Amino acid sequence: MSNLKLDVQTADGKTNGTVELPAELFDTEASIALMHQVVNAQLAAARQGTHKTKTRGEVRGGGRKPFRQKGTGRARQGSIRAPHYTGGGTVHGPVPRDYSQRTPKRMIKAALYGALSDRARNERIHVIEELVPGQTPSTKQAKAFIERLTDRKNVLLVIGREDINARRSANNLPNVQILDAGQLNTYDVLYSDDVVFSVEALHTFVERATGAAEEAKEEK
């Protein structure tokens, strides 16, 4: 494994130096099974889980026996809210529940690094100095810059948390997902065709990831 070097693209179409993508983050083995498990857990955790149907004991009405037990020639009934009645309760219906799954942090990190490595190996990671120069947001400039970087449909833009200018510039662009470095996750990386990092966001992500790895080694 070796560190990958990328040019830092500027809004005027030039380059301003290079950055290194650490091999332990951007050149690891991508396990499809692991990424599948982590993405499934992430999507499950996003489910609201507030579905609910009423049982025969919760439906309004039906407290009185509809007709006497014997002598009518009809099948005996105890309530008009029994499940086989129209308007009756539901049997074995959905109830509120938590769909989240416990996923170890190591698995989450390994899946993310595998997804980023896959994008890096296919030259689908780009690094920019800033999305729009200056302090004035411009959706037009942001759109032109992103289209110059890639012609693929879905783009994941990773920017600094305080980069309000870039966020406002790209917020209305279709098929552009905006995250800060701390929000980067396996699902959004895999869903996107290309990942565009600002220099600030890339440095933040690398520092956090490598710092966490060093702390884990020290604990051992």
UniProtKB/Swiss-Prot annotation:
It holds the Pfam family Ribosomal_L4. It comes from the Bacteria. Gene3D superfamilies: 3.40.1370.10. Keywords: Ribonucleoprotein, Ribosomal protein, RNA-binding, rRNA-binding. The keyword Hydrolase does not apply. The keyword Cell wall biogenesis/degradation does not apply. GO terms for biological process: translation. GO terms for molecular function: rRNA binding; structural constituent of ribosome. InterPro entries: Ribosomal_uL4, Ribosomal_uL4-like, Ribosomal_uL4_dom_sf. One of the primary rRNA binding proteins, this protein initially binds near the 5'-end of the 23S rRNA. It is important during the early stages of 50S assembly. It makes multiple contacts with different domains of the 23S rRNA in the assembled 50S subunit and ribosome. Part of the 50S ribosomal subunit. This is Large ribosomal subunit protein uL4. It comes from Corynebacterium aurimucosum (strain ATCC 700975 / DSM 44827 / CIP 107346 / CN-1). The gene is rplD.
